Amino acid sequence: MGESKVTGQYDASQIQVLEGLEPVRKSPGMYIGSTGSSGLHHLVYEIVDNSVDEALAGYCKRIMVTINEDDSITVEDDGRGMPVDINDDYNLSGVEIIHTKLNAGGKFGGGGYKVSGGLHGVGASVVNALSERMIVEIKRNGSLYRQEYSHGVSKSPLEIVGKAVGTGSKTTFWPDPGIFEDTHYDYDTLQHRLREMAFLNKGLRITLGDDRNGDRKKEVFHYEGGLMEFVKYLNRNKDALHEDVIHFDVSRKDNMEVEVAMQYTDSYSELVLSYANNINTIEGGTHLAGFRAAVTRVVNDYARKNKLLKDSDPALSGDDVREGLTGIVSVKLERPQFESQTKIKLGTSEVRGFVESATTDNFTAYLEEHPKEAKDIIDKCMQASRAREAARKARELTRRKNALDSTSLPGKLADCSERDPALSEIFLVEGDSAGGSAKQGRDRLRQAVLPLRGKILNVEKARADRILSSEEIKNMITAFGCGVGKDFDISKLRYHKIIIMTDADVDGAHIRTLLLTFFFRHMTPLVEGGYVYAAKPPLFMTKQGKDVYYTYSEPEQDKLLAKLQENGGRQKIDIQRYKGLGEMDFHQLWETTMDYNNRTLIQISVDDASQADEIFTILMGDKVPPRKRFIEENARYAEVDI
């Protein structure tokens, strides 16, 4: 985070209004994405982003976020404080305009802010519109100002309620339960985002507190190392190829800046995150394209120049040179152009050349100054290249075999007769025994079954060539029909529901995790598109007289037993606890786990790539201490049958 401050005043005259606030309550999803959990947490980010923009402008050093006892949120900063003077055009204070007019803010003209993630005031007004109550307090001019709102409308004028030392803004809001499905905030979700913001803005101190349930906890996120510390944090459960993090920060006269931190590990997967003005550009864009192009060219040029790659050797591909790379690419610029309203892909064309040039110069300099580390990096890239070539040959062999064999689907697959993928689903079933029951009990029109023998390969510890030689993985790839890795084509997917059906025990959970690791690492669009599900088979079957009940957890079973004993008197109760799917006959399996009307399916989703990468690295990687720590910390959330 640069130390330079934006010149120019920040008062009500700089607040410009684009349109009124009425549409927000009618169509909240257009402004915050959804009225579910992600939208609820988005409210916090909108207010925090305004404070971060004060930090980017050089005026804010501390931000405090508190989840209050009643699940309201307070965000406080030590920035300049929102403008309290009257705007002549609207005869309202700057504070009230910011909170009651949509698209009102001080970021259009460039005087109040040079670089910002959003439009100052868009966030505040949207949050106000979607809150049943909001209180704003401002420290400015030696006075403490206060104003209260409800559902986007001011309930009191802006008034001075006392004296104040210093400057800053404080916002407390209560999300409207009439709009949101649930108004309970998740500490871990906020923790992840605020830690990320602190990494991206070195020196900024962000505090997160939780005052609920009498359990007053507080965490401080403050990283003087910025992106370098971010990369070390992401790699803390991996083994780095070189101890130091490669880092550079380059600026241009027009306020465009790129900062990059990168480090290679012994992992087989890439984790490169990109940001534009602190916004996580999940789909990348011109900054990420420039970075990737430069890394590929620099590694190839260095390898050729130093005879590590022979003239006759093919060039290393982008995938080869990024295997095991953890990187952060963060750009800051005026008026960024995004390719969608949700700002997940940067479209500003001139950024590509700037990032590519900066990366080429600085990464080349690092390799030339660190020949030992350079050789280790290029050795890893060349191993990746050899594995990729072996995997390509394995895929070609499979393709040729499939082209010659009209019955190329796996022999174990019991396919469905429906040919519309949107109406079709496939069950991946643990073991031949349960697979047999599933084949008998299924709806043959729409449900396919593929039994899996034992535990599939742990892809976290294997390269592509070994993965593609695994029989169980080859069977899945062939059955799905959409290819894998670079050949993946979602339009060719044969089933729009891929359902993992494993035993409700430790082994079943392990197999489920192995499958999810494979899908996340090598068929990512399946998970991102919401095509992957986990079936939830029952844990208990309870009989009382002629009545049969199935329950799916111990608390549910306890409730059922209490109810039966209350209503059924002395009538005998028989309980069977299922250890595996194979203990159910095909009628029971259909009735409890496969029947469209009765079953419970859990849709697997990935909200955050770095968090998912971390969990799979911990659970399926080589390091035991972080895995043990993760299991101990999360055991209370798990349902485990030992």
List the model feature ranges, each with a label.
Residues 53-54, 81-82, 506-507:
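Residues immediately C-terminal
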Residues 82-104:
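Short conserved segment of the HATPase_c
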Residues 1-14, 21, 43-45, 53-55, ...:
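GHKL-family ATPase ATP-binding module
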Residues 26-45:
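Conserved short strand/loop->alpha-helix "switch" segment adjacent to the catalytic nucleotide/phosphoryl-transfer site
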Residues 386-405, 420-425, 436, 440-442, ...:
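C-terminal interaction appendages of subunits in large macromolecular complexes
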Residues 88, 339-352, 550-556, 560:
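Helical (often loop-to-helix) elements that flank the catalytic cores of nucleotide-handling enzymes
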